[in-house]
A protein has these predicted regions:
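Activation segment signature within eukaryotic-like protein kinase domains
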Residues: 97-98
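ATP-binding glycine-rich loop module of kinase domains
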Residues: 20-42
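Conserved catalytic-loop aspartate of Hanks-type protein kinases
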Residues: 162
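Activation-segment/catalytic-loop signature of the eukaryotic protein kinase fold
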Residues: 64
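Protein kinase catalytic-loop region centered on the HRD/HxD motif
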Residues: 103-113
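Conserved short submotifs of the Hanks-type protein kinase catalytic core
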Residues: 68-81
Length: 382
């Protein structure tokens, strides 16, 4: 049965041009319902594979389908905040966050799945500061500001295109803004094709990033933000090594890192854990998802019918389980007596006028099943 058939609570989390997102409670568990705009399509094989991935950094898909020509997903609710709402983060925290994202992407890749639409809106940061990657398997280039150049040319997502998106995500987390902007599909495609010419370090310096941090980030830009897929790092394992090196240089040691991390998470605490709680945003489930549920009256009628049927069966059982002749015995006797009917018909005359008939004595000699209470029903022989 659909999870949505048991929804008892619903709240609107987000409504945008790409999708509507609801938080729903069904059978005591919290889920997210993401209902996409018309025209969005999923790769069915990818969605099936994702449902088999058990990694804390990857969302759990529970149900998928289509309503009113628009696809939808139901997945376990992730209590956190989209990275798109975080603003600029400390460099060490941003690198740590991206490193966790890369581990999640590697888990997907091990199952033959590539995200294809990695962007800050699809990375949910939980209350403990760890990320969960959502919205995998969409057909198309995805968010244009994060799509690799080859994706604009119609190529399917792969590890190389996801690596490019990781670079764009890292820049957004450090700078607080997107690296490339545009107002049309073509303008984004052109900007992506010219990404090699962007002086990322100068842009971040203008946003107040320290010189020592800029030098630690430089190898990451060179390994990720490249128009030609062959110029990017080989795979997620190589990227993880680069991130580990960069983190070690900017974190300032374990004590400094734990202090920075605790302060950053505390600063986010006012938002994390408040989304979808309480009555704010409460709404009805979209009518397209409404399912007929038994009302209290219908339940009572159904129960009464079932109970009546049970009582009838019990009565029949006791009626035919008494000591009188069984149905089979009665049938056999009737068959035997009927063999003499031809000889009797025509000889027996009714006292009132001669109509042929069957002797009443013969009929009285036929055995009948005994019924409970027979003889006590108030009927007597004349």
């Amino acid at each position: 049965m659909s999870i949505l058939a048991g929804v008892s609570q619903c709240a609107m989390l987000h409504r945008g041009g790409e999708a509507e997102i609801y938080k729903v409670v069904s059978q005591g568990r919290e889920y997210a319902l993401k209902w996409y705009a018309a025209g969005v399509r999923f790769d069915a094989a990818s969605i099936e594979a994702i449902s088999q991935v058990h990694d804390r950094g990857v969302y759990r898909v529970r149900e998928t389908g289509e309503k009113a020509g628009r696809p939808y997903l139901v997945y376990d609710f992730v209590d956190g905040i989209p990275a798109a709402e975080l603003g600029a983060l400390p460099v060490a925290f941003a690198i740590s966050l991206v490193r966790d994202v890369v581990r999640a992407l590697a888990a997907l890749a091990s199952c033959g799945v590539h995200h294809g639409d990695l962007n800050p809106s699809n990375v949910i940061v939980c209350a403990d500061g760890t990320p969960v990657v959502i919205d995998c398997g969409i057909v198309g280039p995805g968010a244009p500001a994060y799509a690799a150049p080859e994706r604009f040319q119609g190529r399917a997502p792969d590890e190389k295109s996801d690596l490019y998106s990781v670079g764009m995500l890292l820049y957004r987390l450090v700078a607080g803004v997107d690296l490339v902007v545009g107002d049309t599909f073509e303008s984004y495609a052109r900007a992506a094709s010219l990404v090699d010419e962007i002086d990322t370090t100068s842009l971040l310096y203008g946003r107040g990033v320290k010189a020592e941090e800029l030098s630690c980030l430089e190898p990451l830009w060179k390994g990720l933000l490249r128009a030609d897929p062959e110029d990017r790092v080989e795979d997620f394992d190589e990227l993880d090594e680069l991130l580990e090196i960069a983190f070690g240089k900017v974190s300032g040691g374990s004590v400094a890192w734990e202090t920075l991390r605790a302060g950053t998470v505390a600063a986010l605490a006012e938002k994390i854990g408040t989304i979808g709680h309480g009555s704010e945003g409460a709404c009805a489930l979209p009518v397209e998802f409404a399912m007929i549920k038994p009302t209290g009256g219908r339940k009572r009628v159904a129960f009464a019918c079932i109970l009546g049927l049970i009582l009838l069966l019990v009565a029949l059982f006791f009626a035919f389980s008494r000591g009188g002749p069984s149905i089979d015995e009665t049938g056999a006797s009737i068959l035997q007596k009927s063999r003499s009917l031809d000889a009797i018909v025509g000889e027996a005359q009714d006292s009132s006028g001669g109509d042929s008939g069957v002797s009443g004595t013969l009929l009285e000699s036929l055995p009948t099943p005994e019924l409970e209470g027979a003889g006590d029903n108030g009927v007597t022989d004349e």
